[in-house]
Regions:
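Helix-loop-helix hairpin linking two adjacent transmembrane segments in secondary transporters
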Residues: 132, 141-189
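Cytoplasmic helix-loop-helix junction between adjacent transmembrane helices
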Residues: 107-146
Length: 403
């Protein structure tokens, strides 16, 4: 693919603000797990409904991820990033005043629209403002926005919930997001990506062209398998710890936060490896296999607590290898610079598909069997699919690199 940067140099200020926008968006994922039991109790929501509340922010990402990327290619990622962040803030504000489970679902749906828009736009901006030399590293850094934002807000949520209620938490997140939207608006003022033109008929053309890249579609599916396992673990681990170990709210939030920091470490390790010419399929394969093996330990009833914690931390590292590899593959499979946003949208659609069905699937298995150990077969199956998909992409990636 030809160089999509606006200039020969990397525009670091714009890059870091876009990265921060992704972190702020991910905070709205991390605010939920510590508050979910309180929300379920106050809004009279069952376990399965709680799973859908956890996943609803991903529904629109699945449905609109590709469209968000294509629109970003058409009207500019800067505009989409700012509007996306403001939409997240609006959804959080509505959620702060929710009086029923359905109202909370609506607020998470609105947050999902903004999450999809801002994260697709953020990746597109970073791709355009980085030089060829810096791009793989920058995209690897970008892939850590979810674990950093998620982990930070897990701890922040637990602290806020210790002195106030979940509605205050939602309001605080809304204000933080509005602040970053304003910052992004001013810092990116005057930046315009090269080639930001095209007609409405090109939107459909970009979508069709990206879907024709079979390797990219399989990478997105592998990303979905990762996301289903990862978000399920993060969404339900606090509940699991409370039920199994009678953990406090702060401790139940701290352990997932530590796992997420290890996940971010996996992101950066993967970015380092890609910068040294390791193919994406190798990282996808190692990550999927490692996630499957370590989850057997996390949910096993036959090993000690220390060993379970060790498996959970390794789960974070192996899982972190996949997002960086998937995002990095965008530069491999995108046919033209004008389609970067659309291809990023395909990856966002994939990860949100996994985030959508993962938590409800795990909750359904847990509710039906009455034991967390029974979810082993569900997560092992997801990991197995990811392993197979990664192997299938091997020749496709080699062919794409040779073009």
């Amino acid at each position: 693919m030809s160089n999509p940067t606006k200039s020969d140099g990397t525009q670091w200020g714009v890059m870091w603000v876009a990265f921060g926008g992704g972190i702020i968006a991910a905070c709205h994922l991390g605010k939920l797990p510590p508050a979910l039991p309180l929300i379920m109790r106050e809004l009279d929501a069952g376990l399965v409904m709680g799973g859908w509340i956890a996943s609803m922010i991903s529904f629109t990402g699945f449905a609109l991820g590709l469209i968000s990327g294509t629109i970003g290619d058409r009207i500019g990622q800067r505009f989409v990033l700012v509007i996306g962040l403001l939409t997240i803030a609006a959804g959080s504000l509505i959620g702060a005043f929710a009086v029923s489970a359905n109202a909370m679902l609506l607020s998470r749906f609105i947050e999902g629209i903004g999450f999809s828009a801002s994260t697709v736009a953020g990746a597109g901006i970073i791709t355009h403002v980085t030089s060829t030399k810096d791009r793989k590293w920058a995209l690897g850094v970008w892939s850590s926005y979810v674990p950093i934002g998620f982990a930070g807000m897990l701890i922040g949520s637990a602290l806020i919930l210790g002195i106030s209620d979940w509605r205050t938490l939602w309001l605080a997140n809304a204000m933080l997001t509005v602040f970053w939207a304003a910052l992004a608006f001013f810092v990116t003022n005057g930046w315009r990506r090269r080639g930001a033109r095209g007609g409405g008929d090109k939107l459909l053309y970009n979508v069709i062209t990206c879907f024709k890249q079979r390797g990219a579609c399989l990478v997105a599916a592998c990303f979905a398998m990762y996301a289903a396992q990862h978000i399920s673990m993060m969404a339900w681990l606090p509940t699991y710890m409370r039920e199994t170990y009678d953990a406090s709210t702060l401790l139940a939030a701290a352990v997932p936060a530590i796992i997420l920091l290890f996940n971010a470490g996996g992101n950066w390790m993967s970015a380092w490896a890609m910068g040294r010419a390791m193919p994406s399929w190798c990282l996808l394969f190692a990550g999927a296999l490692g996630m499957g093996i370590t989850q057997l330990g996390v949910f096993s009833g036959s090993i000690g607590e220390g060993a379970r914690l060790g498996c959970a931390l390794l789960f974070g590292i192996f899982g972190g290898m996949i997002p960086a590899a998937a995002v990095g593959s965008v530069a491999v499979y995108t046919p033209a610079p004008s389609q970067i946003g659309t291809m990023n949208g395909l990856m966002v659609m994939g990860t949100n598909a996994g985030m959508l069905f993962g938590p409800p699937a795990m909750a359904t298995v847990r509710a039906g069997t009455g034991a967390w150990s029974e979810v082993i077969w569900l997560v092992a199956s997801m990991a197995g699919v990811g392993v197979v998909l990664s192997l299938i992409t091997r020749p496709m990636e080699r062919n794409a690199n040779s073009e």
